[in-house]
Amino acid sequence: MTETKAKSKSKENSSSPVPAAAEGQQQEQKRGNSRGGERRGRRSDRRNQDRDSEWQERVIQIRRVSKTVKGGKKMSFRAIVVVGNEKGQVGVGVGKAGDVIGAVRKGVADGKKNLVRVPLTPNSSIPTLSNGRDGAASVLIRPAAPGTGVIAGGSIRTVLELAGIKNVLAKRLGSKTPLNNARAAMVALSLLRTHKATAKERGISLEQIYS
C-alpha cells in the first residue's frame, strides 16, 4: 500500500508542473498581444495627430440665429469656418449647434468634407485668371508676380491664404456677405486648371497656349 501511494504522489508531482508552465506561456502571450495592441493604438493616434496638425482652421463669422418652432423660438449658433493645409487644399464649412464650440466643430467637419484642390505655381500663385459666383456674390482672382502678396480682404483673403496662395490679386463684386464671398472664392479656385491640363483638354500643345 505504501508503495502504491508513493507512486501516485510521484505521478501527481510530475504531472503538475506541465499545466502550470502552459498557463505561464499563455499569460505571456496575452501580455505580448496587449502590448502590441497598445503600440498599434499609439501609432494610429500619432498618425491622426500628425494629420490633424497639417490643417489650419479659421473662424470667419459666428452668429446667433433663431428658428421658429411650435413652442416658440429655438436659439442656436452658426459658425462659418475655413479649413486648409496651405498646400493646395481648402474648404469652407458651416456648423450649427446650441453652443459656440459645437458649432465650430461641425463647421470644421463640414469644411473637410468639401475640400477643393488648387493647382499652385512654383511662385505660390495661380496659373490663370478665374471668376466664381455664389448667389449675388462674384469674386475675380488673377495671378500676381512674386512679392505681391495676397491682395484681398475679408473671407476671400482667408480662403486664399489657407489654400497656400501667397501672390494673388482678388476683387469682390456684388454681395458683401462673408459666406457668399467665401463660397464664390471656392468656386473660382475649383475652376482653375494648369496649363498642361488645359492643353490636354483642348488637344493642343503647350507652345500653342503660351503663344
From Swiss-Prot:
Residues 1-55 are annotated as: Disordered. One of its GO terms (molecular function) is rRNA binding. Gene3D superfamilies: 3.30.160.20, 3.30.230.10. Residues 1-12, 28-39, 46-55 have a biased composition (Basic and acidic residues). It holds the Pfam family Ribosomal_S5. One of its GO terms (biological process) is translation. It comes from the Bacteria. Belongs to the universal ribosomal protein uS5 family. NCBIfam families: rpsE_bact. With S4 and S12 plays an important role in translational accuracy. Located at the back of the 30S subunit body where it stabilizes the conformation of the head with respect to the body. This is Small ribosomal subunit protein uS5. It comes from Prochlorococcus marinus (strain SARG / CCMP1375 / SS120). The lineage of its organism: Bacteria, Bacillati, Cyanobacteriota, Cyanophyceae, Synechococcales.
